Amino acid sequence: MDKKINVFFGKYKFNTILGLLSIGIAFYVAMFTKTDTGYEWYFLIPGVFGFLLLIVRPLSFTDTGSIGPLILNYTMVIKYSISPLVSCLGGYHSWLGRYPGEDNINKAILITFYEMIVLFFENVYLTKKYKRKQINNVEISKPLRGRVAHCVIIVLGFAILFAMPSAFMDYRFLFDQTDLATTIRVDFAGSGIYKTLFTFARYSLVLVIVDFFYKRNLKRDSAINIIGAFIPTLLNCLYVSNLSRIGIFAPLLSCAFLIIILFNTPKARKTILYGIGTIGLLFIIYLSFVKFFGEGRGDTSNATSWLWWGDTLNMYFTGIKETAIGIKAKSLIDETYGLNRIALMFNDCFSNVSFISNLTNHDINSNKLYNIVYFGGNISVSQICPNICEGIYYFGTALSVVWPALFVYLSHLFSYKSHEKEYIDLKFIYIYSAIYCGMILMLNSAMIVCNIINISVLYAVVAFINKKVRIGVIKR
């Protein structure tokens, strides 16, 4: 009896709490969802999700060593548990976009249920697999292999910032609230490459500073070294494009978790985690309020409206309405591409990748066509097409879950590789990729692929060059 209690309220007590909460939400949604809305079976998603959390182990909500899966686990809770509750409280009200129709909502609930089941069990299997592999590994962390390439990138990136200010018109500091109503778009030739080089420079500067304090800490363990490494990570998040929350969240997490790996003591881990949690949460809350309710952005009365929050949460976590519109958009996708799904996938995945994006057609990628259906015309491209819908476009309904499942696998693989690699820059490459793959339920494939290639893959090239330069210097 004691063993059973320990399973539920010991190591996995957080799973038990979330599982019971989800089941409670399922009962609430079942009782208070009106008929003829299309959402009558919505309660099954939080209900089954909660049941699985109770009986299936070992998903962790506290394992900071697996950053990609950790993010995935929390976003699953929001999409499959919290979102149904908030949507129900708001009466499934929609304040943005067109109504997709009851039939498409029914299909969206079914496809979301399918997605949840497959991703949950895949996540459990991969968690067990990589946990077993990590037990046999001893993690080693080493400083940067030279700084020559990083210093060149820093000089080049910041030189571009000052020489080509027009390429960075959409960038602003976090606390700059001027002209909030305008979303600035910069798309002239070469602007994407300039931004990539500047982003490179920012990360290189952070890595060089982190490397400096890590070397100091190897000689003498001190909290000052942890703080010194964390400050540039924090400053790196203050200057972002159009006050993007992902633009703050991803850099903050990727660099902070790198610091956790390097300064791997219980005291350091706790200090950094509390720092990330407090500062990150304050930034996200502040930025969300500014973007939603700042001057010219929206009505402040929405801040206390369940109707508004229910629909907004669905937008950010690819909810039922968003999936239903994605299903409705399939006819437009078919009309545009016919059977040529390779062209569609190429347009989707590489539309924002530096040096390749000019080979794609932005006007007919799935996100553009999705937004045409979403708004009923060529009005905006602000909404994100869910990955499960892109899976439907590429592989059909039966195999649609293959697409998000691929990124779930990569989130586990990259998280594991971040511990397997020894050098700081290589660890950063895999941490950054793991974070973006872990946000699969929040982002579309274009956003994930472009960040992995623009930053991680190109950074791997820089790491390789840095290694060769260092070897050449040593041989001399």
Briefly describe each language-model feature range.
Residues 1-138, 225, 229-232, 251-292, ...:
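N-terminal "leader" segments that precede or initiate the main folded domain
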Residues 22-28, 50, 205-208, 229-236, ...:
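Hydrophobic, membrane-inserted alpha-helices
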Residues 45-50, 153-160, 197-207, 381, ...:
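Hydrophobic alpha-helical transmembrane segments
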Residues 67-80, 151-165, 279-286, 346-360:
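Hydrophobic alpha-helical membrane-insertion segments
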